[in-house]
UniProtKB/Swiss-Prot annotation:
It comes from Styela plicata (Wrinkled sea squirt). Transmembrane segments: none annotated. PANTHER family: TYROSINE-PROTEIN PHOSPHATASE CORKSCREW. Pfam families: Y_phosphatase. Its EC number is 3.1.3.48. SMART domains: PTPc. This is Tyrosine-protein phosphatase 14. GO terms for cellular component: cytoplasm.
Amino acid sequence: WRMITQEKAQVIVMTTKEVERGRNKCIRYWPPEGESKEYGAYTLLNAKENDFRDYTWRQFVITKESDPPYKQIIYHHHFKVWPDHGVPSDPGGVLNFLHEINECQRSLKNPGPVIV
């Protein structure tokens, strides 16, 4: 989370499933919806989740007790149907996902880089 705050990133894109074919592919780096979790000096709140057919959209709020206090909203886009090997069979899902990411990034004043 230090890198996210250092770069002032507001958009995270994840294309990996957490588990595929019974194997862990990614460790969950966010708390369940409505809950907070501490990551070192940072506290991350998973404020909201919207689940769609091919992806999940989350809104995080990251804070840090500092002088001055730090608070940032982060948008997490998680594409859930990318296969372990190859590419998705339906490009429409990927294109819709990319459209949502681009719209989100454009709507922010100073979004920083997209973190993938």
